[in-house]
Amino acid sequence: MEPIKEPKPLVLVSSSPHMHCGLTISKSMREVILALVPAVLASVYYFRVDAVRVIVCCVLSALIFEKLANKVMGVKKDTIKDGSAALTGLLLALCLPASLPSYMAVLGGMFAVVIGKAIFGGLGKNIFNPAHIGRAILLASFPQQMTTWVIPATKAAATAGADATTAATPLAVMRMTEKVWQAGGAAASQLPPLSDLFIGNIGGSLGETCVPALVLGGLYLIWKKLIDWRIPVFYLATVAVITGIYGAVMGYPSTFPLYHLFAGGLMIGAFFMATDWVTSPITKKGKIIYAIGLGLLTSLIRLRGSYTEGVCYSILMMNMVTPMIDRFVRNVSFGGGQKK
């Protein structure tokens, strides 16, 4: 007598939490790309043809290697159409300096798509932000090229000598000496005014300079409910509080935290990188814990670490902690009673 076989279930129900959104993946990706348009336009305005070159190299590289990775891994679905590869390439480009050689930008696109996403099984299965994986590998492989910053075209014409092409970022200048904020500090005169820092008229990565463009795009995503406001707000607030306390203890002016908020990749990281749907926590409380952790790590690296920028590595480190946050900070299941 043959054993009775159970029929295959018609519906498979995965473990909670369950989330639903009226937007498709491709439409969501297009919305994020649209939100990045102001930052892209600002980068082209300040860095001209080099900005276009780096963006094109990164986006095309991401698309090509997405196609190749799918073929190698036997993925039949054409994931190029969902826009995730193009978005990864664009985000990567906005985290790179305008002077980066084209072949390095192409390699960055490959690293982001293949190592950051494909080897984990594709979109939705990656544990790290793909664009920051690409940036981190490029920084480790080509540190000199990744830390060579071009002065914006709006300033280059009025600058002579070697400084007309390269310059230190405000974060690097602040780290030159502990006395930079004190009267007569050796590097104090090299710091750009806050107005230049705010509008992006400084050296830096393509999309890390113009604060209004990034905030505008971020607010658009919050309005469209594509990202949760808690992550950027608590991330930025944590950095502001920690750098403010540190500045007060060290006797620095009250503008010290503003320099940290406006400089480097904090704005693009807070609105576009840390809010990645796949690599950030699901619950509201989890997002707050995640964002505060990002702020703590970013401030620690910037203030006391050997590297002047801490956004990229902070996000990658908190990406690793995200599964643990989701595990211990969960919503109570319907009908499951109170959480113990």
Describe each PLM feature range.
Residues E31-A39, V54-E66, S84-G89, A93, ...:
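Alpha-helical transmembrane segments in multi-pass membrane proteins
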Residues V49-S61, S99-G108, L197, N201-V211, ...:
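Structural signature of hydrophobic alpha-helical transmembrane segments
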Residues I64-K76, V113-K125, L216-K225, F271-S280:
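C-terminal ends of transmembrane helices
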Residues L91-L96, L100-A160:
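Membrane-interface helix-loop-helix junctions at boundaries between adjacent transmembrane segments
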